[in-house]
Each structure stands twice: as C-alpha cells, then as structure tokens.
Amino acid sequence: MPGPIRNYISLRLGSLSYRLSQGYRQNVESNIRIVTGRDSNDAEVRELTRSIFLTNALNFADLLTLAWRSRNWFARGSQVVYGDWAVVDKALKRGKGVIFVSAHVGCFDFIGQSIHAHGYTLTVVTGRTTSRFVFDGVTWLRGRRGTKMVEPTPSGIRHVIRSLRNNECVVLVADRDFFENGHEVEFFGHKTTLPPGAVRIARDTGAAVIPIFTRRTHSGHEVRIMDPMYIEQTRDVQADVAEGMKRLVPVLEEGISSALEQWVMFQRVWPEVAPDSIRIFPTGSPLESPLLERVAQKLPEIRSSDESAPPRRRGTEEIASGDAADV
C-alpha cells in the first residue's frame, strides 16, 4: 500500500480511537496535565492528547512495514540531530556493552530497527501489556530483522547480562513503571516510581548507558543520541542506583519534552490516588468504630527502633539475581 494512503487510513483510525477510547484518553490527559501544569480542559492538553493518538496509529502502521525496510531506507529516513553513532562505537571499545535507554516517544520501534540496521547486535527488553496473541505478533514483527526480543523475566535478564558481557547492545524503555515496584523519583516535579533496571544492570556490568530518542517529522525521523552515562559501583547498592536514577531522570524529561505531542504513553505515569492505609480490623468489624478511633488518637504513639528508616522498595536489590520485574 502506498505510504500516503497508509498514513491517511492510520490518521483516520487514530482520530476515531481518540474519540472512542475514553479511559486511555483520560490517562493521556492526566500525564500531559502533569507535565504541562495545565488543566485537563485546556485546549493545549486536548490537542496534545489527540496528537498522541494519531502518532500511535502511525506507529502501528510503521510497525507493519519497518521489518521489511532496507538499511539504506533507514539511512535515508533518519537524521541524527544530536550526538553521533560514533558515541556508540566509542562506548563499545570499552568491551562492556551498551544499554540504550529510551521512552515511548515518536516511533520508538524505529529506534530498535535503526540501531540494528547500523550493524549493532541488539537485544530489546519488552514487557507484555496486552493479550498474549497480540504481544506475540508484535514481538515477531519487531524481531524479524534479527533483533533478539526478551521479556523482563529471570531468563530474559540473564540473556541481557550475557549480551552485555559479549559487548553487545541492549534497549530498554524507562518512562513508566509498568510493574509498580520501581525506584521512587521526582519526575517532572511530581513523585512517582520508574524502573531502575537499566541503571542497576549498568552498575553491575559496567555497561555504558546511552539515552536515545526519536521524533517523527514530515520527511522521516529525527534521532537524538545523548551522551553516555557510567554508573559508579560502590558497596552501597541502593545509593548507587539512586544516584544513577538521579542522573537519568532529567535526560528522560528532556527527551519527552522535546516531542511531548508524540509521547505515546497510555497508562498513568503518576498515581493520583494514594494507596489505602493498612486496616487494624476487618471491614465491618464492631471494633472498627469512630469511638475507638478517637481513643486511639489520644494514646501515645509507639515507635520501633528502626521506624525512622524508609520502607524498603522491592526490586533494587534483585536485578543481579535475575528478578526482572523492575526492568
């Protein structure tokens, strides 16, 4: 099918999806509202949200064709507007591999295909957020050119570590904590959690972390290859991960802000409702009454010896042992 016709159909379907997908539309509006600081009824928020739905439709259409494109096509269709592929070559000379970290911006599938088309041996970590049938179909399309696709499972992470030790490249996206057990950060000025997997694996393997982003243009795709990051390894794992995330988050913010109208994120990145407090008594128990609550408020608070320590978040200690839930 000719490109203009394919794009026309995709845009129509994207516009229809925007009107019909109320839940996803509200999720996108929530994310955009937090990033821009505007109200959800603001015209800019609505326009950015609509643009994201259109971008998503174009991305899916591209996914159906990218696997059959030639290397020359990727060279003609992409323009590196920041950095250079020489940055990757220099990082690989260290012999410890490269972890590309990206976000769901632009045609993010183009990044993996473009990296592979430039001759780099590549593994992409992708988590399943749809039905198994759809996920397997999309995974097959993404890996058709030879890219190795792995899920964030113990075996998948072991493959990632082996790839890095073989001085190969790995791609992870880090703009949403899909498993909700990541590292707490301040993202666009609001607290949330993001997956620390890339930082933790880089710390343990010595691999370079290179953020990379793409943006759609009328003539193709812009690519931004950011400066490499190296995660220091000390005896304090949590401190190393926290410092690495502190350095990575501003780069993610910059990459997303550069193409906010193409940030194809349909889940809420920031939780809007705080989790329920732990109940002392079962729901409906006669012991759970306003009277007893008032009595409890008057009683002195009992503190344990380690109460001042922050709660331990699952995940930042487990990547090396093969737990992939944080990737």
Describe the residue ranges of each PLM region.
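Acidic active-site catalytic centers that drive phospho-/nucleotidyl reactions
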Residues: 31, 109, 175
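Active-site metal-coordination segments of metallo-dependent hydrolases
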Residues: 25-27, 128-132, 191-195
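Membrane-anchoring hydrophobic helices of lipid-metabolizing enzymes
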Residues: 1-102, 139, 144-146, 292-306, ...
